[in-house]
């Protein structure tokens, strides 16, 4: 890994709402990333189960963490709040009931850098009480033009509409926000905005 001071800042936006049973593992996995130059933005969206207090506790332990407490407004509004304060050249999103592999952002950063890309993507696991399985992993690296990426995204093949399995260049979100009070907000942002702007 390169010197942290020479690496671009990655802002990771994490909406948090009543996920105390999962939140500690989530935050540990983010704080433990091999890519160290992180700004970790936790948006406590009016939690009532102690999740907000746990966010504050982690912020006391790790100076890279910023916590914003707001009245419950939904995931889109929480992500928008994070976008408004994010300082990084690169953006990532993590759902607060998920955890990520220790080298996820190092891996995604090197994919961006080595391929001159605007967005990089990785596979993911689905973990249940019974089993864990890998989703959308061919074991191969692929590079897409903007047109190919949009077509693949719309056809729902190797690229999915999730925000949390990708790393984005910040400029893709200039003037872009998640639609509030709308289901499948990931699709609106992925197809309509960021992928159309990517090169």
Give short role names for the model-derived ranges:
Residues 1-197:
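Nucleotide-sugar donor-binding/catalytic module of glycosyltransferases
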């Amino acid at each position: 890994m390169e010197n942290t001071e020479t690496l671009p800042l990655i802002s990771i936006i994490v909406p948090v709402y009543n996920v105390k049973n999962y939140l500690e593992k989530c935050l540990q996995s983010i704080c433990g990333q091999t890519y160290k130059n992180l700004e970790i933005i936790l948006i406590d969206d009016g939690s009532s189960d102690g999740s907000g207090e746990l966010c504050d506790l982690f912020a006391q332990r790790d100076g890279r963490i910023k916590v914003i407490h707001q009245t419950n407004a939904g995931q889109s509004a929480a992500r928008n709040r994070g976008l408004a304060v994010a300082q990084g050249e690169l953006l990532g999103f993590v759902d607060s009931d998920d955890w990520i592999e220790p080298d996820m952002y190092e891996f995604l950063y090197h994919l961006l850098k080595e391929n001159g890309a605007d967005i990089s993507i990785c596979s993911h696991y689905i973990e249940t009480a019974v089993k864990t399985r890998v989703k959308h992993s061919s074991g191969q690296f692929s590079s897409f033009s903007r047109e190919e990426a949009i077509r693949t995204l719309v056809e729902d093949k190797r690229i999915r509409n999730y925000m949390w399995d990708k790393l984005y260049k910040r400029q893709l979100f200039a003037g872009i926000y998640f639609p509030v009070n709308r289901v499948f907000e990931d699709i609106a942002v992925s197809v309509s905005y960021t992928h159309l702007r990517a090169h």
